[in-house]
Amino acid sequence: MEKSPDLVLIQATSIRSSNLPLFLIHGDDGDISKYFLLDPLDRNVYGIRNRCCDSAKAWPGGIPEMAKAYLDLIRAVKPRGEILLGGWSLGGLISLEIALVIARNQFSPLNVEGIIMIHTIFPSHQLRIEQVSKRPDSNADSHNGVGPCMIHNQRMIATWRPSPWPIRHIYTGLSDFESESPIVPQEPERISEIRYRQPPPPTILLRARHPASLVARCNNAGYCADTHCHRPMLGWESYREDFIVSIIDIEGNCFSIFDNNYVEGYISTDTLLDLHPICNRIAVVQFDAPVRLYLGLLVITLIDNKNNVMLFHYFTVRVNSDICIISIDLNLPSTGPISQTVNSKLAALASTTQGLNVPVLDLIFPTAAYTQLMSDTGAREMDQRKRQKDFTHTTIHDKNS
């Protein structure tokens, strides 16, 4: 795919950096110039602009069409691996739709590790489409068609609702399962199936401190304004209670938050660390013999030293010859059939490895953690006290643990 003028590199970092790239989607005005005001984030940061604003035209397919087009732009520079998404206002909604498109494809080589929403309001709290349609295109003579662009975008928002997170089908139950596919077994009669609704990426909400001035300014400008933006989560509690993992109040209102006297420090490396999936942990395990293990939440495959490959979230990660990594999705209830399946699998692994003691490490970003772990020659010489922790204790923990 040829380089598109709609995808702009805003910040560049060292080619050796393992920090996840951040893709920031335009706001209601279709512009990305405001993102150039952000502090250095020690990663590649890209901005995606709305090309339709140049001609003041609308996207016929609305937000879903925009998400698919923008995903193609992302794949052009990051065809596989983990990414972060984000954006101001409408950009947060498009980021969520992109994440949904990726999540629906179980074999997608891309994975969204987190989302940053900059004063993005849940769309059910916007004015209804009838009210938006009555707004005159009074700003049609605005610079570069920004006025009509915002009207088109508000109409799209008024008709869009985020879909529930996709249901995954996970097969478990075989320790000697030799299929090359992480999903479909060669002997399905020997496999049990678990269906679960996977959690969305951890999301940070940057919330403007002055919603009242936001509403007044929107109304005066003739745009659709949200009359419920005083809600603590800007309405996202109506989507999923576990969707927003952190709320950060920022100065100004939705229009002024990118003013020079406000913008410093809004998105920083510390903010990005908050996107750490707090319910995920990894365990580093040494095996003397080839082992294949299937857990009921994620397809987790430990492969023998000869192949030296592990499938994780359907991604392939190279590891050292005698170290494999287990990742357990802990963002689920601590009781019930699914967690019971996981506990039984953990117990089976402990039995298989004859009570192997395993240390547990916290993850910030998986890619960076893997790189650091694999390059750290001291990883095999971990503290002996940590090694005393029995593997059977590395079970599902509460989200707040």
Swiss-Prot record:
Q: Which UniProt keywords apply?
A: Hydrolase
Does the keyword Phosphoprotein feature in the UniProt annotation? no
* EC number(s) given by UniProt: 3.1.-.-
The reply on keyword Transmembrane is no
Q: A single GO BP annotation from the record?
A: biosynthetic process
Pathway membership, UniProt: Mycotoxin biosynthesis
Q: Domain of life here? A: Eukaryota
Region (Disordered), start-end ranges: 379-401
Write down the SUPFAM superfamilies for this protein, in alphabetical order: alpha/beta-Hydrolases
MF annotations from Gene Ontology:
hydrolase activity
What role is this protein assigned?
Answer: Probable thioesterase; part of the gene cluster that mediates the biosynthesis of gramillins A and B, bicyclic lipopeptides that induce cell death in maize leaves but not in wheat leaves. The nonribosomal peptide synthetase GRA1 incorporates respectively a glutamic adic (Glu), a leucine (Leu), a serine (Ser), a hydroxyglutamine (HOGln), a 2-amino decanoic acid, and 2 cysteins (CysB and CysA). The biosynthesis of 2-amino decanoic acid incorporated in gramillins could be initiated by a fatty acid synthase composed of the alpha and beta subunits FGSG_00036 and FGSG_11656.
Which family does this protein fall into?
Belongs to the AMT4 thioesterase family.
Q: What name has this protein been given in UniProt?
A: Probable thioesterase FGSG_00047
